[in-house]
Amino acid sequence: MPIQVLPPQLANQIAAGEVVERPASVVKELVENSLDAGATRIDIDIERGGAKLIRIRDNGCGIKKDELALALARHATSKIASLDDLEAIISLGFRGEALASISSVSRLTLTSRTAEQQEAWQAYAEGRDMNVTVKPAAHPVGTTLEVLDLFYNTPARRKFLRTEKTEFNHIDEIIRRIALARFDVTINLSHNGKIVRQYRAVPEGGQKERRLGAICGTAFLEQALAIEWQHGDLTLRGWVADPNHTTPALAEIQYCYVNGRMMRDRLINHAIRQACEDKLGADQQPAFVLYLEIDPHQVDVNVHPAKHEVRFHQSRLVHDFIYQGVLSVLQQQLETPLPLDDEPQPAPRAIPENRVAAGRNHFAEPAAREPVAPRYTPAPASGSRPAAPWPNAQPGYQKQQGEVYRQLLQTPAPMQKLKAPEPQEPALAANSQSFGRVLTIVHSDCALLERDGNISLLSLPVAERWLRQAQLTPGEAPVCAQPLLIPLRLKVSAEEKSALEKAQSALAELGIDFQSDAQHVTIRAVPLPLRQQNLQILIPELIGYLAKQSVFEPGNIAQWIARNLMSEHAQWSMAQAITLLADVEQLCPQLVKTPPGGLLQSVDLHPAIKALKDE
């Protein structure tokens, strides 16, 4: 058989095999189109589980007459126009395949009217070449899509449809998920002429718990803990059920959204499960309704035919952010109120985990802000409940203010007691000295500095090593351990196992958590400066170092680790150098006063100036 271009109908049917799995898939695609059109009311009529009829009517912006034929063509869309748009998608649909694919396996009719038009127009595709016919019709502003006799021309696909009840249950679940994503939209669902679901729009700032309770049940609402967790361009909002009261029925409630798009993502589920694992049994699952907002440039939604999955460009960052957000809510349940007496309250040892330098924990920082209202509160019982924090109902991404981002990155100052705000002092009030101003980068890893008219060279790798040693050295409290996404399992000798067991308490202070069995050791958590390292190389070297020691001091181990960490910067930039020096000045002020050998070298310009003048 020679190579030939497939007929449009055949090509569309092949595409429909990926997009149109069952009637619920059709409902999902069409309702998402309505939401992208700005609809505030969507009516969904289903007959015989969607096999006979699926009708979606909305009050969105509508489609112009001259664009109706394009709407039923493949790869025609108003959502994106360039590669840049594809890399920062904020709409639910973008491929332009859904209507063409659905019309190839059903009798689809599209009726629409825009506010500028005096009359509505109806379009449908038919024939082998999928030619589109357009004719006048009566219709208010908005769009109606009717899908009749789904899979009528593909008997094999129609044969594998389940019972009417099962197919409608799948549609009902899709509508529940969409209703949880858009509280600002009224959604009505009917089956065989009977209204089954009515979700009324909630006004801005109104009560969201009524719809949450209607979809997830009062049992979930009574155990729900509200989350509002933010860092820079990442925001996590929603609810997670108290794991101490999770039941098998509640465990079925697992709804996750990324930039308003409903998602089934293993990375997100793993982060939530890991945060709850200490309170859940081996056979239990957490219950949650969570909304993640992220810079659209940092997530790829074009990786799954039905757009059920996404890929994060910085998956570990997102995982740790969600883990810390959920964990903070659960820990808040166990903490007592902050005392308000006159005794000084020690600030949490968060300095090593809140540095701007590479390897820091961007998210272990509830104390890194000025005192504000709680960002998360347990949802009260039904009745007279105040409105819980809720993500913006409108889809899309909004950049956070730069000032807020800067405040989130500040290191918390030791807190003596709660009192009226006073004028803030400079961050280095007790150590007003600094290395100076960064002029440029020399030989890729040295910073040329100017201070009080003097010029000096600073070795950035050496400064980074001192910073990491300070981050790793425990103070009054152990260094915060961060669980690994995938624990590292290594085979060890009897001598190495014995050394590890002797050093276990010292390693725990450094944030290194492990479990050992007969011949293996499993590294479960490491401090943040180690998260970006190649642990397959570093940990065996650390075990070899410990096997040669007889005394295990956390400070000595931290020094060894700092000296053996690989630098993340083969070529340093000005911004990276400035950030590093700011961290060193705050965390290691003694280096400014008495720089160790190999860190700082003054540069004498007088001979060069003299030579120029002599010329």
Swiss-Prot record:
Pfam families xref list: DNA_mis_repair, HATPase_c_3, MutL_C
Example GO molecular function: ATP-dependent DNA damage sensor activity
Alphabetical UniProt keywords: DNA damage, DNA repair
GO terms classed as biological process: mismatch repair
Annotated stretches, region: Disordered: 363-397
Gene3D superfamilies: 3.30.230.10, Histidine kinase-like ATPase, C-terminal domain, MutL, C-terminal domain, dimerisation subdomain, MutL, C-terminal domain, regulatory subdomain
GO cellular component, one term: mismatch repair complex
Compositionally biased intervals (Low complexity): 364-391
Role according to the record: This protein is involved in the repair of mismatches in DNA. It is required for dam-dependent methyl-directed DNA mismatch repair. May act as a 'molecular matchmaker', a protein that promotes the formation of a stable complex between two or more DNA-binding proteins in an ATP-dependent manner without itself being part of a final effector complex.
Family under the similarity heading: Belongs to the DNA mismatch repair MutL/HexB family.
Protein name: DNA mismatch repair protein MutL
Source organism of this protein record: Escherichia coli O8 (strain IAI1)
Phylogenetic placement of the source organism: Bacteria, Pseudomonadati, Pseudomonadota, Gammaproteobacteria, Enterobacterales
Gene transcribed to yield this protein: mutL
